């Protein structure tokens, strides 16, 4: 019988051994961590802030809740959740990459956000938390980098409290053929050059474009969430489907 770790899996448009992908993704984010926020603003023309704000507005997070921000990176969502949960609540910023986690921790501490935020280096596929721990779980622009997405969805469901919700904000498939063509041109011709100029790294942004294309589309991800055990799963397209916000509940 073949070892599952020896099976091939997508890394952008490349096929790599399953047990190699995490290290390859780690290399990407080690490289881009220092310029991650700057590149996000440039790549999305600042629109990523609106996508994240909408996600926060849809989260239902309120005072006293416990929130898990997976692939929380530089802490954009965590910072807002920290204000919402107050001193009685807690936000756990989790990221598999230590460089991204350090950038996020330093940024939030510089802003004086220290009392109710905890930082954990964690793999979304094997979350190191007890069952039924969190009221809300978010993962923004991180699921496409996970090796075993189905396993990660199940892991998130396990640590979600009954009555809790998960929100997945991720690049998706534009609904218009014209927009899709423009998006392809921008992604494959502009992004890598921008990455080279700003972050001295075109390869990581080539991977970014490829990983977006290989990520499940809106309906496929919805079906994956339902298969993992989430209920009342829905999604909303933003910016013509360039990004989609999926929501699911645990009852």
Curated annotation (Swiss-Prot):
Name this polypeptide is given: Ubiquinone/menaquinone biosynthesis C-methyltransferase UbiE
One example of a Gene Ontology biological process annotation: aerobic respiration
Keyword Cell membrane: no
MF terms (GO), sorted A to Z: 2-methoxy-6-polyprenyl-1,4-benzoquinol methyltransferase activity; demethylmenaquinone methyltransferase activity
Protein family membership: Belongs to the class I-like SAM-binding methyltransferase superfamily. MenG/UbiE family.
EC number: 2.1.1.163, 2.1.1.201
Principal EC category: transferase
Catalysed transformations (reactions): a 2-demethylmenaquinol + S-adenosyl-L-methionine = a menaquinol + S-adenosyl-L-homocysteine + H(+); a 2-methoxy-6-(all-trans-polyprenyl)benzene-1,4-diol + S-adenosyl-L-methionine = a 5-methoxy-2-methyl-3-(all-trans-polyprenyl)benzene-1,4-diol + S-adenosyl-L-homocysteine + H(+)
Function: Methyltransferase required for the conversion of demethylmenaquinol (DMKH2) to menaquinol (MKH2) and the conversion of 2-polyprenyl-6-methoxy-1,4-benzoquinol (DDMQH2) to 2-polyprenyl-3-methyl-6-methoxy-1,4-benzoquinol (DMQH2).
Keyword Methyltransferase part of the UniProt annotation: yes
